[in-house]
C-alpha cells in the first residue's frame, strides 16, 4: 500500500510538472485584449497555454527584479525600445539562441545580444488638419521648429517615453546642441500646454485648437471610423533625409524562467507571417517581418522611408534625451 502511495504521489508530481511546462506567463504593459486573440491561436497550434499579467512597465520590471527566482514571469513584453533596453540593463532578460528569430527580425529591430526582439513597428510622424493646411506645407520634424508654426503646434508631454525616444533618435542624427535648438523651437511654437496622450493631441488638432502635431500612427488609425475626425491627415516626415522615426513593441525571455524552451517557441511564433499579420492588424501597427500584410485601415497611407537607426540607441540615449528636454523647456 505504501509503495502504491509513493507511485501515485510521483505520478501526481510528474503530471503537475508537465502541466506547468505547457503553460507560460507573460508580464506585459500591453492591453490584454490586444494579445489574447493571437495567444489563443498559439494555444490551438501548440497546446501551450499563455497567462497574462498586465500593468505599468516600470512596476512590472521592478516586480520581476524583486521576486527574482520566485517570479512567475517567463516573458516580459512591452512597448518602446527604450523600455526594453532598460529591462536588459536591469538584467531581466536572458540571451536567446534562435536562428528563426535571427532570420525573421531585422538586426536594427532587436538587441545586439538577442535579449529582446521587436515584433511590431510603430511609426511616429506628422498629423495635420486639412481645414488649415495641405501636405505641401510640411517636410520634416525639424521644420516644425520654424517660427512660421508659432501658436499652431501641439505636442504630447516629454515625460512619456515616445517623445523621449524621438528626441534620442534626433540626438543620434544631429548631435545634442542642434537637437536642443530644434526642440526649443517646438516649445516656442506650442499653441497650448503639452498633452498627456496622443489621442488628446489629435482631438485638439481636429477641433482647431492647433493645426499640427507629432503622434504614433495607430492613434490616428483608431479614430478613422469617427466622421468628426475626417479633417485629420497624415504626413510622412523626413522622406528626403533620415526617414520617419520608427519604434517597436517587443519582448524578451525573463532570465529566471523555468520554461525557456516554450518561451522561445512563443517568440518564434510572434515572428511568423501568420502571427505578424494577425498581431499587426489587431494593434494597427506595422509588421517587422518583410512581406507580411498590413492593416487595411493604414494601407491607404502608402509606403514610407523609415529611419533605420538601431533601436537600442533609443534606450542608450534616453538619459540625454530627458536632460535635453529639460534644458529646452519641453515639459
Annotate each language-model stretch with its function.
Residues 151-159, 269-293:
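Periplasmic-binding protein-like
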Residues 285-331:
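An extracytoplasmic/periplasmic, membrane-proximal ligand-sensing/linker region
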Residues 82-86, 206, 211-232:
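A ligand-binding cleft/hinge motif common to bilobed small-molecule-binding domains
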Residues 16-85, 331:
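Early extracytoplasmic/lumenal segment of secretory-pathway proteins
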Residues 125-132, 246-259, 278:
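A bilobed periplasmic-binding-protein/Venus flytrap-type ligand-binding module shared by bacterial periplasmic
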Residues 29, 36, 72-209, 244:
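Extracytoplasmic ligand-binding site segments that recognize negatively charged/polar headgroups
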Residues 1-23:
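Short, low-complexity disordered leader/linker segments with a strong preference
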Residues 38, 182, 249, 258-270, ...:
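Short amphipathic alpha-helical coupling segments at ligand-binding clamshell hinges
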Amino acid at each position: 500500500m505504501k509503495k502504491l502511495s509513493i507511485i501515485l504521489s510521483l505520478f501526481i508530481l510528474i503530471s503537475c510538472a508537465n502541466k506547468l511546462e505547457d503553460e507560460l506567463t507573460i508580464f506585459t504593459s500591453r492591453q490584454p485584449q490586444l494579445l489574447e486573440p493571437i495567444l489563443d491561436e498559439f494555444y490551438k497550434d501548440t497546446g501551450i497555454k499563455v497567462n497574462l499579467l498586465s500593468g505599468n512597465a516600470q512596476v512590472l520590471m521592478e516586480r520581476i527584479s524583486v521576486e527574482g527566482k520566485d517570479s512567475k514571469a517567463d516573458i516580459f513584453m512591452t512597448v518602446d525600445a527604450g523600455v526594453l533596453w532598460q529591462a536588459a540593463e536591469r538584467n531581466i532578460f536572458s540571451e536567446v539562441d534562435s536562428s528563426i528569430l535571427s532570420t525573421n527580425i531585422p538586426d536594427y529591430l532587436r538587441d545586439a545580444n538577442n535579449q529582446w526582439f521587436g515584433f511590431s513597428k510603430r511609426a511616429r510622424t506628422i498629423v495635420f488638419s486639412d481645414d488649415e493646411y495641405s501636405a505641401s506645407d510640411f517636410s520634416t520634424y525639424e521644420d516644425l521648429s520654424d517660427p512660421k508654426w508659432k501658436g499652431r503646434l501641439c505636442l504630447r508631454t516629454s515625460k512619456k517615453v515616445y517623445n523621449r525616444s524621438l528626441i534620442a533618435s534626433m540626438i543620434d542624427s544631429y548631435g545634442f546642441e542642434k537637437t536642443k535648438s530644434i526642440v526649443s523651437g517646438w516649445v516656442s511654437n506650442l499653441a497650448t500646454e503639452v498633452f498627456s496622450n496622443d489621442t488628446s493631441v489629435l482631438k485638439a488638432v481636429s477641433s482647431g485648437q492647433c493645426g499640427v502635431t507629432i503622434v504614433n500612427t495607430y492613434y490616428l488609425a483608431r479614430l478613422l471610423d469617427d466622421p468628426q475626425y475626417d479633417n485629420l491627415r497624415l504626413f510622412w516626415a523626413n522622406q528626403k533625409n533620415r526617414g520617419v522615426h520608427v519604434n517597436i513593441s517587443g519582448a524578451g525571455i525573463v532570465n529566471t524562467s523555468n520554461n525557456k524552451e516554450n518561451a522561445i517557441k512563443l517568440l518564434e511564433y510572434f515572428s511568423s507571417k501568420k502571427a505578424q499579420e494577425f498581431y499587426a492588424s489587431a494593434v494597427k501597427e506595422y509588421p517587422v517581418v518583410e512581406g507580411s500584410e498590413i492593416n487595411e485601415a493604414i494601407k491607404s497611407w502608402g509606403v514610407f522611408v523609415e529611419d533605420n537607426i538601431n533601436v537600442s540607441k533609443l534606450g542608450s540615449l534616453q538619459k540625454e534625451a530627458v536632460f535635453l528636454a529639460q534644458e529646452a523647456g519641453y515639459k
